[in-house]
Amino acid sequence: MENDKLSPTSLAFIALTNEYCQLVENCGDHGREGMVEALIKLLPRIYITVTDLEPNLEYLDAFISQALDEASYDVVRDNLSALMGEDDAYLEVFLDDMKYSDTPIATSISENLADLYQEFYNLLVSLRDLNTEEQRQILGMCKENFVEYWGQTLCNVLRALHSLSVANRDYYDNY
């Protein structure tokens, strides 16, 4: 009977991705400093939890649907960009292209956060109405996507958010 349930780690990961999606969808309610602070606390928890997920390489029948359309993605990215303002852009150092470039490569916090939102939104939509085994397969695919793509995105944007948080003079007043 225990095999009919997701592991506590899987449930925690789903809850954290849902929390992330809600945070991003309501980013205007937090202000920039509040949003940065919330993300700095949430993103490492997502990272740790996904690394603890059991790998599931048997996902022949499962797939993560591409539920988030381009217009919705653009709204999320634009809202985050407006919130981050002039601090949205940062220099990327972990792109393969950077190895061969003398020119810095810029990216944006808003685009990275929107990319994560898209991954998590699609995951959550895909998990709905599936049986436990299919959910395990979807989570296995998500973990593989973490290794291949969005794990680095999460780390990169966390680095940029950390830089913003410590640059804020009020940050040290809280300690």
Residue ranges: model-predicted function:
Residues 56-124:
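Long amphipathic alpha-helical segments
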Residues 29, 52-59, 86-93, 126-133, ...:
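Intrinsically disordered or highly flexible coil/loop and linker segments, enriched in small
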Residues 104, 119-175:
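Acidic, proline/glycine-rich low-complexity IDRs
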Residues 2-4, 12-70:
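N-terminal interaction modules that seed assembly of large macromolecular complexes
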Residues 2-30, 82-93, 99, 103-106:
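Generic detector of solvent-exposed, compositionally biased contiguous segments
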